[in-house]
Amino acid sequence: MKSEITNVDVCCVVDELQNLINGRLDKAFLIDNEQNRELILKIHVPEGGSRELVISIGKYKYITLTNYEREKPKLPPSFAMLLRKYLKNAKLIKIEQVNFDRVVIFHFETRDGIYKLVAELFGDGNIIFLNNEDTIIAPLRVERWSTRNIVPKEKYKFPPQKPLNPYNLEFSIAYEVFKDYFLNNKGVECVRLISRVFGIGGLYAEEICERAEIDKKKRDLSEEEIKKLFEASKNLFDEIFNNRKPQIVLKDNEYFDVVPIDLKKYKGLEKKYYNSFLEAVDDYFAKFLTKVVVKKEKSKIEKEIERQENILRRQLETLKKYKEDAEKNQIKGDLIYANYQIVEELLNAIRQAREKMDWARIKKIIRENKEHPILGLIENINENIGEIIIRLKSEVDDKVIEERVSLDIRKNAFENAESYYEKAKKLRNKIEGIENAIELTKKKIEELKKKGEEELKEKESMQMKKKIRKERKWYEKFKWTVINGFLVIAGKDAITNEIIIKKYTDKDDIVFHADIQGAPFTVIKTQGKEVDEETLEEVAKFSVSHSRAWKLGYGAIDTYWVKPEQISKTAESGEYLKRGAFVIRGERHYYRNTPLELGVGVIEYDGDVKITTAPPKTLQKSFIKWVLLKPSNKEKGKVVKELKEIFKDYGIDDEDILRVLPPGGCEIVKK
């Protein structure tokens, strides 16, 4: 059963992670489980929405994009806080595998320069944060080896490189390196040599041997056999690079391995195929991590049950003692009554003797009269507390009962018997109380067991709950709304501004632009239909509300519209247009002092109920449910929480809300 991805797997993972390039890091979380640690980086990709990148070290070592919900700590650990401090809104510009090893570097671009996050997926695993000069800022784990140290302020050194990189097999020198390695290591099994030359695990080394039809244990290969192995290696890696069939391999209905291609070793075993290797890796490890979390929860519940069972054991021991003591006290009282006259005579004799002589004399007389029918009953005298201990017996139901009975010489036989009965009564009252406590403890244990089973099922269900990634329509990549039946889209940044104008603006569309630096283009998709004045006024409000003016707290600004043919990417002579910027030539149709008025609500559009923003008049006319917003410094997370509660009946999640809100902060002004 696989617990960590191989360097072959890493190659496939890194290839598929390239879709994250140009994404920006939003938050970093660190989850500590009993056996492993997961670093989760929430990355927002311009045209792909938010994704969660998981780097896991410990027992389970892997990297993937996850679709599974995880319970994140409310207070992030220091390593996660450090990444948030340095990499907040940093652009992910490069992801690379180092030397076909289990080492991946994530390059982030910030205003202060380039930073790197290195994931090492061998040994116990590690995650190391570097500056642009490869100096370690902080590792998740401090480690020391003979060849390198992973400690702050030291230069990061990569693990030793393997002789041959699978990416370079097409070069003629690759075969020479491969052949020389075999010829220089005669006497070693070929499967071991393949593993060493490429730095790959036994699974893929054996696959190469099997494809070359050469016994994996064979030594001293001929050049022809070496050539066969090399060709089989090329064939295998070509399949890994270009013709994957991502899959989870099952054994006895349990997840056993996750691999990117069909392997001869797993021929005949059940397989579950996927569209991407990342998805397969995500599903595979989510299964095992759930078991770890559930096992941890189970351990907590079992400890509490064990604690209650210890309480129950002590209660039962106490109950047993109370019952035994109550019975003994009852018997002693009964024995006094059964021997009432003897006891009374004895007590009187002791009291009378005490008036005439000291205790030493009395004890001597008793010792000298061991055969006396009454004095002979006395076993001991505790003169300090006025107690004598006698042995009494009586026949009850043909059974002789005999006990040592303590008597208070200051009391008569009746009073001594009543004293024992009173003790028995008090103990019986305690028995009733302890029996009630025992029932409550038993009930608590049963409730814990039942609750534990339910909580474990709930925990398992929650841990295994896979987030359904909504299939977003093309326009949901941007800010968008629907005004009087017209679809309106707006850019969110320089990248989406450029995409909208170049890819999604047709010749009959109308393009708005707020008269403030950095404002997004807002496009009315007319589909050749005439747009009335009311619609233009509403779109004008939408365009200014999604500009920087909202963040700056302006009440109104100018905006204008133009036709697509007036927009050009050709700068004036001697000028340069940066990304997202265009030149507008010709007449501009202005809407002066357009108020920033915006709300958020749900609308039925394109066969679904969606959340988006719109000016008040449009909200009232077309939206199912809505609220008005105003610029504010209120924490965005709190606003999202409030809006999620308002629209809870429509299946709206946090990401849906965050995608549509205007730039900067806001708060609800009217529900």
Curated annotation (Swiss-Prot):
Keywords in alphabetical order, please.
Coiled coil, Protein biosynthesis, RNA-binding, tRNA-binding
Coiled-coil intervals, chain numbering: 291-363, 410-465
| Entry GO terms, CC | RQC complex
GO MF annotations in UniProt: ribosomal large subunit binding; rRNA binding; tRNA binding
Which top-rank group of organisms is this from? Archaea
Listed GO biological process terms: rescue of stalled ribosome
Fetch the SUPFAM superfamilies from UniProt.
S13-like H2TH domain (SSF46946)
Gene3D superfamilies, per this entry? 1.10.8.50, ibrinogen binding protein from staphylococcus aureus domain
Read off the InterPro entries from this record: NFACT_RNA-bd (IPR008532), Ribosomal_uS13-like_H2TH (IPR010979), RQC_Subunit_NEMF (IPR051608), RqcH_archaeal (IPR043681)
PANTHER family tied to this protein: NUCLEAR EXPORT MEDIATOR FACTOR NEMF (PTHR15239), RIBOSOME QUALITY CONTROL COMPLEX SUBUNIT NEMF (PTHR15239:SF6)
**Can you tell me which family this protein belongs to?**
Belongs to the NEMF family.
Quaternary state and partners of this protein? Associates with stalled 50S ribosomal subunits.
Q: Report the function annotation for this chain.
A: Probably part of the ribosome quality control system (RQC). May mediate the addition of alanine residues (Ala tailing) to incompletely synthesized nascent chains from stalled ribosomes, leading to their degradation.
This protein is called what?
Answer: Archaeal Rqc2 homolog aRqcH
Q: Which organism is it from?
A: Methanocaldococcus jannaschii (strain ATCC 43067 / DSM 2661 / JAL-1 / JCM 10045 / NBRC 100440) (Methanococcus jannaschii)
